């Protein structure tokens, strides 16, 4: 986009033209000024056209004369080019401002986070008993109170977990007892349905048929014993010196 008000002047301070130097200043003579304006305007329009063709550029040229007359050139549309220009200026301005605002915000947030990290580190050192040499008695009492509250919370949580474990074990014990009772009931029902199974070792009536062995020795009963000598022939004698071996045979 190019905006130019042609006043009959050049952009450089001095320019060599023709046979001498022409001073760049406002032309006082009205006729000469108008002639110069027409020549320079046509040259400017020609340059704009050449730029758009040679470089495939979007060019829009607007020129107002000293009398307020409008002269324009555009290879596309003057209005469309102006709208594009406004949008580009707006986007650049917004992008710059948003980026600057974001940068400031992140810098502030970063500073806050660094301060929080330092504060937490100092608090942890104090809880561990470090860096307490410069603390006042009031600060030490506050620290002691914090530690007591922390210990109480830890102890409460520990007791809660222990009680939960005990409750679980008690419920587990009840479940196992119920399972055991159910198993006994199934065994008893099995034995009622199959009486022959009750006579086998391991059945419920096995202990009634075969009483448990007695731990106390039974009293001696002479009726259960016979002398072995009474079963031997009369002519059999032992040559022991006045003694006979007598062996008792118990009948069960």
Curated annotation (Swiss-Prot):
Residues 103-193 form the K-box domain. It comes from the Eukaryota. The gene is AG1. The keyword DNA-binding applies. GO terms for molecular function: DNA-binding transcription factor activity; protein dimerization activity; RNA polymerase II transcription regulatory region sequence-specific DNA binding. The lineage of its organism: Eukaryota, Viridiplantae, Streptophyta, Embryophyta, Tracheophyta. GO terms for cellular component: nucleus. PANTHER family: SERUM RESPONSE FACTOR HOMOLOG. Residues 19-73 form the MADS-box domain. SUPFAM superfamilies: SRF-like. InterPro entries: MADS-box/MEF2_TF, MEF2-like_N, TF_Kbox, TF_MADSbox, TF_MADSbox_sf. It comes from Brassica napus (Rape). This is Floral homeotic protein AGAMOUS. Keywords: Activator, DNA-binding, Nucleus, Transcription, Transcription regulation. GO terms for biological process: positive regulation of transcription by RNA polymerase II. The keyword Metal-binding does not apply. It is found in: Nucleus. CDD domains: MADS_MEF2_like. Probable transcription factor involved in regulating genes that determines stamen and carpel development in wild-type flowers.
